[in-house]
Amino acid sequence: MMITLRKLPLAVAVAAGVMSAQAMAVDFHGYARSGIGWTGSGGEQQCFQATGAQSKYRLGNECETYAELKLGQEVWKEGDKSFYFDTNVAYSVNQQNDWESTDPAFREANVQGKNLIEWLPGSTIWAGKRFYQRHDVHMIDFYYWDISGPGAGIENIDLGFGKLSLAATRSTEAGGSYTFSSQNIYDEVKDTANDVFDVRLAGLQTNPDGVLELGVDYGRANTTDGYKLADGASKDGWMFTAEHTQSMLKGYNKFVVQYATDAMTTQGKGQARGSDGSSSFTEELPDGTKINYANKVINNNGNMWRILDHGAISLGDKWDLMYVGMYQNIDWDNNLGTEWWTVGVRPMYKWTPIMSTLLEVGYDNVKSQQTGDRNNQYKITLAQQWQAGDSIWSRPAIRIFATYAKWDEKWGYIKDGDNISRYAAATNSGISTNSRGDSDEWTFGAQMEIWW
């Protein structure tokens, strides 16, 4: 009995140590950027984006503090079978003060189960909110294939010649459907859920060090019983993607071709906007009565083409390079589409394994389908950087920068709009007659960026 009692504290200590080790085995990942900047003509840092373009060249051209904090853990494992719980909370503020309150965005909360289906070894089933197999161009922060959101699916089914993934996700648009009360008045407007069904076949060997990925996305508006879409709403649409990835020069090149129809053209990345894509508006009658109407302007019947080439390569011991070239044409029946092309490079010269100089040059040109006018802008940034490693991808990084931008614009700028409406390619009320005009500006500052 004495021996047992003497062994008990040791057993408790060992058990506590094991449980403590398990409790600490939490994966912590994330992304963050923050800094301070000034504008040459005065005031805080100004950021530059061509009106109608869906992105901007980001080096020395980001005016917010943004962070994504991810916590995850493998909560169960038996042999090659496992369950993993993943979360992600994101924050964004204007970096104007010490105390800047904000509501966090709960972007991910999902469980992934690996090798749970005996006859599909290597596959993963999942459910919840998730960043799902996103494809982007880092230097312009542009996501061209991204169906992230609440959903479920199965991925990486090994077919021998490639891997198949199936998923369904959802995105909701405000004010998308309505119901009648009397006299055909749109009395109540309700958010509309849009469902996307995604099929991908990846890992198709095409040539030495080259692989092909093919994808089909179908999205449709899913209205609540008793509600309907505005007359003529696109309701649904398709997006087709082919992406070839070539490993080269210690990096990669990606060549992408995409085609989308109707509801899949607005965001152009695989998420649908199948209702009218707008909020309601209110009319006040002479007697003071207010009536809510659904906005009947339909903004996305048509098609979109996109051809994109981007990559990151090493040009020797001292030089790395990022680059992008893209052409996109949105042709809408309401004549509010755009033709956008962009080209840019970001070379990096490495003075030491942890210190470098970067130069980013980017040009955007956007033509209005309605007016035929073009907006164009080029932006040049020179940055001195200290980073954790000798790659153009090495982070964390601290950089000081100077940016110069020049633009000549003739359509679509809403001077006092927010970051969305100010750069909207087309709004539900038509294209604004305001313009940024022909001008230029320069900024300077410092920024940190990290991912882990």
UniProtKB/Swiss-Prot annotation:
Gene Ontology CC annotations of this record: cell outer membrane; pore complex
Residues in coiled coil: none
Record flagged with keyword Transport: yes
Annotated GO MF terms: maltodextrin transmembrane transporter activity; maltose transporting porin activity
Signal peptide extent: 1-25
UniProt induction comment: By maltose.
Primary role: Involved in the transport of maltose and maltodextrins.
Official protein name in the record: Maltoporin
